[in-house]
């Protein structure tokens, strides 16, 4: 009024500030931390599962690679056996031929190594020859073989009782009654052996004994025991007859053995004339044994082949995986090199 200036009224909006109690703020912080912990746990679990899946795939891949390498070694041996027949001729087999040379361990591109060897099964004692009409004669031979290796002769009785069809204990052997008392209990096979690794099942047999006799024993799917004089070990040759001395057998092995016929062998080694009908210079049965390692995976494959003496055709009779592999060398591979 009059000379006074009149001020315009204005409104001030009220600002509402809410203060949480200390307890509520603590609960909120714990909730956040709990959520973070759950997320971390889930992430860790997912990462762990992922690593497990990757590891499983890696192991599966390495195992498959090892298997393929083993098959490759098997096929190479088959081809070598066929080439030996078709190129060198069917008349003779000896240890200087290509098939008899072991594939020494060598490194693989995928990391690891491969080793392979071919064993002539006509150059060793066929344990299945303990069955049949000549079983007792062959048992006596097996005992002489064990004697030459300083192994208990009673183990021969154990092997005979394992493969024969009866339950009559032979000498120091054992039938079902001895095995059923073991833990776990089991029975004798009472049938021909399928693989020489069955020796590990024999009652009270020691690993040292198996290591000593294994190079001289083999399994052929028949009771035949035809001996290839060009590939047989000294102990096996010595076992053939009491008239054969260990010195004579050792002399044969230490000579260059590539006899073309039994007649020339007998002329050079007359002590063997008594067993001439059981001797030969060719082989029909072979075992190819390969061991492969790829990464952390190891594969052992034993393959039994029969080679037809008329056509040279090589037939796969059976495969056995994870069998005992007796290497011919000691290998020390530096993974970083």
Give the positions of each predicted feature:
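N-terminal leader/signal peptides at the extreme start of proteins
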Residues: 1-25
């Amino acid at each position: 009024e009059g000379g006074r200036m009149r001020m315009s009224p204005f409104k001030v909006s009220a600002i509402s500030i809410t203060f949480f109690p200390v307890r509520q703020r603590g609960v909120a912080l714990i909730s956040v931390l709990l959520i973070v912990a759950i997320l971390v746990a889930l992430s860790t679990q997912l990462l762990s599962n992922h690593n497990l899946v990757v590891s499983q795939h890696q192991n599966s891949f390495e195992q498959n690679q090892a298997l393929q390498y083993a098959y490759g070694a098997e096929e190479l041996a088959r081809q070598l056996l066929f080439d030996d027949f078709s190129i060198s001729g069917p008349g003779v087999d000896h240890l200087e031929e290509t098939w008899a040379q072991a594939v020494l361990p060598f490194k693989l591109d995928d990391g690891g190594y491969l080793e392979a060897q071919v064993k002539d099964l006509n150059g060793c004692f066929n344990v299945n020859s303990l069955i049949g009409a000549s079983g007792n004669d062959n048992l006596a031979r097996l005992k002489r073989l064990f004697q030459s290796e300083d192994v208990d002769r009673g183990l021969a009785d154990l092997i005979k009782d394992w493969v024969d069809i009866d339950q009559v204990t032979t000498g120091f052997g054992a039938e079902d009654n001895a095995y059923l008392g073991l833990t776990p209990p089991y029975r004798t096979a009472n049938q021909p052996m399928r693989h020489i690794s069955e020796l590990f099942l024999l009652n009270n047999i020691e690993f040292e004994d198996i290591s000593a006799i294994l190079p001289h024993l083999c399994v052929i799917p028949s009771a035949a025991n035809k001996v290839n004089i060009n590939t047989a070990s000294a102990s096996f040759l010595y076992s053939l007859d009491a008239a054969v001395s260990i010195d004579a057998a050792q002399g044969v092995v230490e000579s260059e053995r590539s006899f073309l016929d039994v007649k020339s062998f007998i002329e050079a080694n007359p002590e063997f004339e008594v067993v001439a009908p059981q001797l030969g210079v060719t082989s029909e049965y072979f075992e190819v044994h390969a061991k492969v390692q790829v990464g952390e995976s190891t594969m052992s494959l034993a393959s039994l082949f029969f080679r037809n003496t008329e056509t040279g055709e090589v037939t796969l009779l059976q495969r056995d995986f994870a069998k005992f592999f007796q290497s011919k060398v000691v290998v020390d591979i530096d993974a970083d090199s």
